[in-house]
Every structure is written in structure tokens, then in C-alpha cells.
Amino acid sequence: GSHRSHGEILAKGLSSIYKLDDVELYDIMKEFLGGRILSVVEGREEVKGNIKELAIDFLLYGALAEVFARTTGFNEGLGGSMHAFFIPFGIFPNNAIVGGAAPVALGAALYKRANKKKGIVIANFGDGACGRGPVLESFNMSGMDQIRQLWGETDNGNNPGLPILFNIFDNFYGMGGQTMGETMAFGMAARLGAGFNPEQMHAERVNGYDPLAVIDAVTRKKDLLLRGEGPALLDVVTYRVSGHSASDASTYRSEEELEEWKKADPVRAYKEKLIIGGVASSDEFDAIDESIVRRMTKICRLAVDDELSPRMDLEKDPDVIARIMFSNEHRRTMEEGREPDVLMPKADNPRVKSLALKSRWAFDENGKILPKAKTFGLRDALFESIIDKFYEDPTLIAYGEDNRDWGGAYAVYRG
């Protein structure tokens, strides 16, 4: 998600609700936080017994309770408005770092590629983040030549790129600076793709005020990512009507500019298109609007109810954050039943063999200090623990210069 990603949280959540069957949905709601969120909304749905309707209430309430710092929020009120996430619906953690979604999504895509997992990953961020190092480094790493030229074939017999779509909300502003013609050099964000691989990241500039244009573009990008042709980039042109924050008086732009963009309101324009096209009637849209008001009124009242939605009491329970932060569990592997993909048995690794000859005690049998070359050192201990994990957990990967031929500044990774 982007820096402030409430809309993305809801969009991804609603998509998951639509795709999951009722049994899966209910199990997710029942098991998450021991059913704490579910217990607040269950029985209050407008259509009793309708799991999809219940799940929508669950999503809205979990997100809003998080914004209001309630223990019934998705992250028990500790994430707040900018850091909410819900992994069961595929909503990855957000952060306060501008452009921080790019490397998080890159890591998720790298996981999918390295572990031959299905699906794609989408990183959402604004045009104001396109000058940030994490974003530009993510562009570069996502298109590294080695991914498609050296990493070897997957089960499909091809060498796929990373399944990641960098989705830029190009709303012309980063806080108060206008990216086009002021704070950036690219003019149009889609041009960035030309700097990172021969395919120019399949970059495309799209009218973000036209939902059908966005759907078409994302569908095409999804198809090419699933074919292994990633990464991809979309420059979705939109506009930020509101200020950056509540204290933003928008003094950096004119009233005329704001009014012109408001006249082009995409929600109203799309509604009119659907009515003119005979897809839906004005009465149907009125009914939808009324149902949204009823639902949100209900959810807001629940989220601010101190009894149903309490805040965390750190005076009564000072250890609660520690319990949330640390699982106190030990998982030897993140994927049970799958064998690690290794080049040789661990016992045949040359460095493992050489370490077996080293003393794990600093003195010989006569009490004399052994030479450092003959003793098991700190770098050896680090290497041993790392390589042990690679033979336990098939999802673990290592990358970076330290893992290349030289083995790092202290030879921890050598061998």
C-alpha cells in the first residue's frame, strides 16, 4: 500500500471477500485474534446469515477500529491509520516511509519467484515517491539480468522475471511539491521504465479517472506477469483533491485548478456512463448510496464504542506489546513437507568439512593456546548457523555482495 493506504486496504480486502468461498471467509474471521473482531460485528449484518455481507462489515470495522487505536482493530490498535495490514486477505504491511511499499512488495515478489509460488504482487505509491532511493532501487533489483538469465528454469520451462507491478498513483503532488515541472525530472512517471530494462518495464500511462481503462491496463499487466515477463510499471494519472493532511491549506495551488478537477469527478462520471449505457438505473445507485451510509454509520458507532472497542490498557497489562511482538515459538521451517533445494549434502560442503577439523576449544591437550587458524571462530559459528538453516528451511534465500565469491568482509559466507 501507499503512504496512506486506506483505499487500497479496502479495495484489496473487498477483492479477497469476493474471491474466497464462505467457509474460508468464516474460518479466517473466526480464527483471527480468537474471533475478537468477528464477535463485534456478527449478528449485526444487514442480511442475516450472509457471509459476504458479514465479511464486509468485518473488513470495515477491523480497519476503522485500527484507525481509532482500538484493540479490536486488525493490529490491535498499534498500527493506526498508516500501518494497518491484514495478511489473511493479502493486505501486506504498510509503513510511514514514503515509497516504502516498493521494497516490501519487491521482497514478496522475490519470495514468489524463488519459491515457485503462484500469483503477482502490486506495489502502490505516489509520483512524489519516485525520487526516493527505495523505489528506484526496487525498480533496478526487480529487473536484474540474472533473474531471467542465470536463475534457471521453473516448472513451466521458462526463466520468469519477478511477478511485480509497480503501480504509481500519479496525482501531481508529493506533499506540496508538484512533481511535473517542479520537483522531479521525468515529466511523466512512465518514462522511468526506460531506465531499468530493455522492455522499459512495459511502462504505460493510464487515465486513472476511467475505471475501465485502469481495469484493462491492470489486466494486461497481470497477464504478462503471469507469463513471466515482469516487472511492469503503470503510471496511473489521477488527482489529489484533498490536502496532504488536515493542516494542509493547499496554498501551493489555485482554487481554479481544484474546481476543474472536481468537475471531472470520476465517481460521478462513471455513474453517469453506466446510467446512459443502461447498465444500472439512478434508483439503483441511490439505493447503493443509502446502504453505504447505513453500513458506515453502524461501523463508525461500533468503532468508537469504548465497551465494544476498548483501547489497550498498558497500565493494567504492561507486557501486552511484548506478547504481540514476540511469538515465543520456534518454527524450523516456513514450509512444512518441502525439501530444501541444495547443490549437495551438507556434509559434502567444503567449508563444513574444514570446520570439522577445527577445535571448538581454545587450548590443546597440554593447555597451550591454539593458533587462530586451528580454532572455531565467530565467523565460523555464524556460517554454521546460517548453512544449517538453509538445509532446514526451503524458503530461505541469500543475496547480495556478501554472498558472492569473496564471502564478505569477514568471510562469514565463504563456502
Could you tell me what each predicted segment is?
Residues 110, 115-119, 185-220, 263-291:
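Conserved thiamine diphosphate
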Residues 1-164, 175-200:
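Cofactor-binding active-site loop characterized by glycine-rich and histidine/acidic residues
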Residues 120-124, 165-167, 233-235, 397-399:
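Structural motif
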Residues 102, 125-131, 141, 168-174, ...:
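Acidic, glycine-rich active-site loops and adjacent beta-strand->loop/helix elements
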Residues 137-138, 217-220, 415:
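Alpha-helical scaffold elements adjacent to nucleotide-binding pockets in ATP/GTP-utilizing enzyme cores
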Residues 1-27, 31, 38, 42-46, ...:
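Conserved acidic/glycine
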Residues 223-228, 233-235:
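Long, amphipathic alpha-helical stalk/connector segments used for oligomerization, subunit docking
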Residues 1, 122-126, 204-207, 396-402:
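Short glycine-rich or small-residue beta-strand-to-loop segments that form or flank ligand, phosphate
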